Design a protein with these regions (language model features):
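Short hydrophobic beta-strand segments
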Residues: 14-17, 142-143, 163-167
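N-terminal carbohydrate-binding/catalytic regions of secreted carbohydrate-active enzymes
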Residues: 3-8, 12-31, 39-44
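Post-signal/leader-peptide non-cytosolic segments of secretory proteins
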Residues: 295-358
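Secondary-structure "cap/kink" motif recognition
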Residues: 5-13, 149-162
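PLD/PLD-like phosphodiesterase catalytic module centered on the HKD motif
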Residues: 27-90, 95, 99-104, 109-130, ...
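Mid-sequence helix-capping/hinge segment at a functional interface
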Residues: 127-146
């Protein structure tokens, strides 16, 4: 999490945060420190899902320290996870600021410095900060807003010509499922990677019967938990964001993601997805041909067998010298280290990062 903490510590003028769940004391202290040194900090927290109980401690800590903090409109869930610094750059996240999950959960952060995107994010934040109910945000260049993102994400899946790799926490959107099944029937190599959940068994079976590779992780404390929300199309463009594949998330919640073709994002993203595909368990009844991988599988150990990994120094190919490396990035290189079961953080020279669990 160090790169994200560093980003949160970097503002000269302003920091705006919209967060579904905030329970990270380190993040809270950074926000307080920013406020004390004169940065305009505004923190918008979800209130609807739990009546504020999940975020109450963070709300109290920040407000006691004088940090401007507000509850989002409680007519819908504010599931967005975004941090914008100085109106120049935004961290668009699939995960919450909840430290108990950092080492065991698959999530991603993408940095967006596209001026039109950041301006759109700030415009939506200003409206949300005023207490308004969520509505589709300004489109920017690459942004995907909920409410109303289902057609945009289904169209992204439909655009595939070779492969689609998906990670998500939920599978309860007819439009998304139909798009995945349609791709598979027309010969696109489609892979869905999720944590096993009986709630989605019917969807998994239908996807598999239409030729989709369904790769599952057990819902146990020792296994990687798939919380990320990703659609990787042809290893050439990808959606990364907060949207789950459910009617509530796509059509009602406040959510934010983006679609990117940036090589600095796709490199580490494709590597992580490939590792997740190769380390998961294929669903019974799925197609017997090898599942799609965004790039050739990494040699990472399965999440159930943590390994101490050294990710410094970096070899000539931008990888780690250590065998079984999990901390991997594109040709910009990566830095990071982890002990058994701890989180590994990688960052490239363009400031794009992701984290993985051993």
């Amino acid at each position: 999490m160090t790169p994200l903490y560093d980003f949160m510590s970097s503002p000269r003028q302003s920091l705006d945060m919209t967060m579904y769940e905030l329970s990270d004391p380190t993040a809270e202290q950074i926000l307080i420190a920013d406020h004390k040194r004169g940065v305009r900090v505004r923190v918008l927290l979800d209130h609807d899902y739990s009546g504020g109980s999940v975020n109450q401690a963070a709300y109290a800590t920040l407000s006691t320290a004088g940090v401007p903090v507000a509850w989002a409109n409680d007519s819908e869930i504010f599931h967005q996870k975004t941090i914008t610094v100085d109106g120049d750059e935004s961290a668009i996240m699939t995960g919450n600021l909840t430290p108990q999950y950092y080492a065991t959960t698959r999530d991603f952060v993408v940095m967006d410095s596209q001026a039109a995107d950041v301006a759109a994010i700030e415009s939506a934040f200003a409206r949300d900060w005023s207490g308004a109910a969520p509505s589709p945000g300004p489109p920017g260049v690459d942004l995907v807003w909920s409410p109303g993102s289902e057609p945009q994400l289904a169209a992204l899946i439909d655009s595939a010509t070779r492969s689609v790799v998906v990670e998500n926490e939920e599978m309860n959107s007819t439009a998304i499922e139909d798009a995945l099944e349609s791709d598979a029937r027309r010969g696109v190599d489609v892979t869905v990677v999720m944590t096993a959940d009986a709630e989605w068994d019917s969807a998994f079976s239908q996807l598999a019967s239409d030729g989709v590779h369904v790769v599952l992780y057990p819902d146990t404390s020792s296994a990687l938990y798939i919380h990320a929300k990703v659609i990787d199309v042809d290893s050439a463009k990808a959606f990364v964001g907060s949207e789950n594949f459910s009617t509530a998330s796509l059509d009602y919640n406040r959510e934010l993601g983006l679609i990117t073709s940036s090589a600095s994002v796709l490199g580490p993203l494709n590597s992580a997805l490939s590792a997740d595909v190769s380390n998961g368990q294929p669903q019974q009844g799925a197609s017997t041909s090898p599942p799609a991988t965004a790039t050739p599988p990494t040699s990472a150990p399965p999440p159930s067998s943590p390994t101490t990994i050294g990710c410094s120094p970096i070899d000539d190919e931008g990888g780690c010298y250590e065998p079984g490396e999990y901390c991997r990035n594109d040709d910009h290189g990566a830095t990071g280290r982890a002990g058994d079961g701890q989180t590994i953080t990688c960052e490239d020279e363009n400031g794009t990062w992701y984290w993985e669990s051993t």
